[in-house]
Amino acid sequence: MRKSSMGPDTEGTQRMLLNNEFVFQYGPLDQGWWPDGLYTAPTYEAMVFDIIKTKEMGFNMIRKHIKVEPATWYYECDKRGILVWQDMPSGDLGNQWEPNLGQMGGTEKDRSPESEAMYRKEWNKIMDDLHNFPSIVVWTPFNEAWGQFKTKEIAEWTKKKDPSRLVNSASGGNHVITGDIVDLHHYPDPKMPRPDLFGPTHAVVLGEFGGLGLPVSGHNWLEKNNWGYQSFKTADELFDKYSSFMNTIEGLIKKGLSAAVYTQTTDVENETNGLMTYDRKVIKVPVEKLKQVTDQFYKKSLVELKR
């Protein structure tokens, strides 16, 4: 039904491919939280609403962030043509995080035998349970060093278990050169891993950026102490900054970027950096405007593959 692979462009930078063609993958960080049920959507229709609005906003991918959804969620992504990056929910603590590519300082977690066994059991079960959903194109075993351990071994095991999908070994670090993808987190403005250093062997992606905040009175979890990586008072101000980021992303695509993830789909409790409010009653910028500034990402003329 689909092939997820990599191949070089004419500059020798590895690109993420879909059915042997380069398709820039752009999606929101989606934590799947709800103000009443937390990890449980109030209705099936509410769950599907998020997917529909995501596509209407111009995204073609969702990074399902440190959560596993019901099988029906993945079915709806299959049906609606939305790609999925699936995170392993983070567990355990105690690592030192080094988010900067090429710098030392990050540490691998020395997990207890019980913790390591539980991780392997749960990650194995997640991959087994979700294997038959073609929308999933990327597995992400670790995020921002949280509980990260034996990175090379885990990435290689993940790839051996499921060679049909790409492996993003550590989204945002700690960075170990393994798997298929090198993933940088950078807030608020978009940056990318250096394609001259990492591109010959790995796809380079921006695993998180943005986080532009706009509290909407009457729809906040907390009326005070809300935050975004950069906050605004009006929707027009937010959109102007978002639009400028989209122009930057287009330039990065030409230089070697294969994918980007914007933080985030909805507000989550005191995080008011969603494109929708936590209760989903307010879409902060009209979906038509958001789509208009992302359509440019999908032009085939941006990238030429080596044939």
Model regions: which residues?
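Substrate-binding/catalytic cleft of secreted carbohydrate-active enzymes
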Residues: 49-53, 61-293, 302-306
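N-terminal carbohydrate-binding accessory modules
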Residues: 1-54, 288, 295-304
